[in-house]
Amino acid sequence: MTNLRIGHGYDVHRLVRGRPLVLGGVAIPWEQGLDGHSDADVLTHAVMDALLGAVAAGDIGKLFPDDDAAYRNISSMLLLRRVAAYLAQVGYQVVNIDATLIAQAPKVAPYREVMRQNMADALGVNVTQISIKATTEEHLGFTGSGEGLAAHAVALVEKQ
């Protein structure tokens, strides 16, 4: 049996007024933010789900339930650190992450390197192990109409 395992994560959040927009641990100036129990960092949530999926540990809703007040407005970077600690506890390390943000706006290219570094720091890996891309849906669907943002992530982990 191989020591490598792969996981896929997907998350979506609605855009609303009166909330900050946090993506990859970066507060991005924008007229709307993402609605959610935590900071609603859709990109980091997809990454956490990919990591948890790779080790068959469920998803972030199982580990950090949205009906638990302890996680109200909590930083997803803090939760990502907890996921990293869990991976280490069960004997896995991150090989690489490949994440894609789906958003018509705002453009995230100016923030991409900081996002990568934030995730690398939280996971205790080199920034070269973190890939973050962004795309639009050409004004189609809920992300294209500006109703929300979505993210996919794939994680490769290795048993130690």
Predicted regions and their residues:
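Short acidic capping loops at alpha-helix termini that bridge into adjacent secondary structure
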Residues: 126-129
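Glycine-rich, charged/polar anion/phosphate-binding loops
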Residues: 7-9, 138-141
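Short active-site-adjacent structural elements
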Residues: 109-110, 139-143
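RNase III-family endoribonuclease catalytic core
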Residues: 2-114, 122-123
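Pyridoxal 5′-phosphate
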Residues: 132-136
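C-terminal edge-of-domain segments
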Residues: 143-160
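Active-site phosphate/pyrophosphate- and oxyanion-stabilizing loops and adjacent acidic/basic residues
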Residues: 117
